[in-house]
Each structure stands twice: as structure tokens, then as C-alpha cells.
Amino acid sequence: MKKTQQKEIKNVTNITGVRQIELWRRDDLQHPRIDEVAEEVPVALVYNGISHVVMMASPKDLEYFALGFSLSEGIIESPRDIFGMDVVPSCNGLEVQIELSSRRFMGLKERRRALAGRTGCGVCGVEQLNDIGKPVQPLPFTQAFDLNKLDDALRHLNDFQPVGQLTGCTHAAAWMLPSGELVGGHEDVGRHVALDKLLGRRSQEGESWQQGAVLVSSRASYEMVQKSAMCGVEILFAVSAATTLAVEVAERCNLTLVGFCKPGRATVYTHPQRLIHN
């Protein structure tokens, strides 16, 4: 497979993720108008010529999605395990063609599964229930986060959703410094995909997962917790609620899980010792 530089891949996926369509408003069904709707396309991740997963996603920043998914699913251990990547059109969507190291590809073949995902679904098509959970090393306790800094971050999360501002149809995942500043984020029609894009980008840039937290605009499902923990994230803030399985996984892997995050409000589900509130 042809090896492609990162900047070349970005040119392939330089898509807005928005399409204009004709629609009707409730108060005027006689006169159509033009409005923006978020794009959702099938994206296949193909490792060394073998299709591994098809996800429904926004057609942008797919190189970060592929890297983040590969890391958060345990397919690779570091970005160095990927030798090349191409984003190419396919008959019904897009393919991300990934060249893996031989060692990682052999491991992938041993645990290969075929997924046909709903929007951002990370478990559709697993071969048996035992395949759902992945062993995650317990996270260290290396930081303390002041909850008073959360409110400012919540007010700025929408800044990372330009498509969402136009369409009302995307989730966001952003990295939050201990100061409350958001220093990078991604959006997608799928919440898991938005998170994978963030994980992929920070890993590609060699950023540390300590001294900060992930903030997501969605609920906290177990996949969100597991993906975060697989990459070394110690604290996950979610705007909506957490599921019981998410709480169980977070407790087991030492991740601090916080839901119902609104200005002046937060519900801590696990490991509050990382949090400060004066």
C-alpha cells in the first residue's frame, strides 16, 4: 500500500460535513426553503487490505478517527505501529486504508471481528458477549482537577462544533486543561467517533494525557469510558448521564467519571479523590 504523509491525507478529507437540502417548516408547508443538514457516511477501516469495521461518521478528520479507534480498541499500542494511511472514496462511502506493522496485524487477525455500525456504535457485530469488555490497566492517580474550572469549559464546548452550530446534529469531544481552557476538540455525528478523533489527534501530536481531562457533549456509555481509559485518560466529564456499565468499568480501571455537567452542577460517579471543589 502506498505510504501517505499526514498532510496529504488531510487534503483528501477536507470536507465540511454539511450539505444543503430543501425542507419545509411546520408553520409554512407550502413553501420549501434551503437549510443545512449534517452529512453521515459509511467509513470503512481497512487494515492491510482487510476490512475490519464500518462506522457511520462525519466525513472529516478521518485520519484522526482511524488512529484513535486503533488505539482505543487495542489494535495498536502507539502511532508508530501504523506505517501508512490513505483515505479514498469507495462505492458507497469512504475507506481509510491503514498499513499496520506485521506484529500488530497478526494480533488483529487473532481477534478480528466484523462490525457493521449504527452511528458511532462500537459493539455492533461482536461475535460473542465475552468480546465486549477489554482488559484495561488500572489508571494511576497523578492529578487533581478543580471543579470550579469546569463551568468556563462548558460554555466554550460549542466552539468546537461548527457543523453542530449549523445543523444541531453533532457531538463534541475536547481536551480540557486544569485551568478550564479547551485546547483541542473534534465533532462528529457519532459520539464515539468524536472521541476517537480527539484521542487520535492528541496521540499523533504526542500530547500527555496527564494534567487535564476529556469533556464530551454526550452521555457516558461504557465504550466512552473504556476508550478513554485505553489511552490513559484519568478523568472523563460528560454533559449527560452515565450508564451502569460505564460506572462499573470506570470504577474498575480507576477512571474518575463525572456526568450531568452543567454550569454549577456535576455528578461524580467514581473516584472523587482526583477532584477539588472549594
From Swiss-Prot:
One GO molecular function term of this record is:
sulfurtransferase activity
Q: Where does Mo-bis(molybdopterin guanine dinucleotide) bind?
A: 260-265
Q: Where in the cell is it found?
A: Cytoplasm
Task: Show the active-site residues.
Answer: 121 (cysteine persulfide intermediate)
Q: Which UniProt keywords apply?
A: Cytoplasm, Molybdenum cofactor biosynthesis
* One GO biological process term: Mo-molybdopterin cofactor biosynthetic process
| InterPro entries registered for this protein in UniProt | Cytidine_deaminase-like, FdhD
User: What family does the entry list?
Assistant: Belongs to the FdhD family.
Q: Quote the function comment for this protein.
A: Required for formate dehydrogenase (FDH) activity. Acts as a sulfur carrier protein that transfers sulfur from IscS to the molybdenum cofactor prior to its insertion into FDH.
Q: What is this protein called?
A: Sulfur carrier protein FdhD
Q: Which organism is it from?
A: Escherichia fergusonii (strain ATCC 35469 / DSM 13698 / CCUG 18766 / IAM 14443 / JCM 21226 / LMG 7866 / NBRC 102419 / NCTC 12128 / CDC 0568-73)
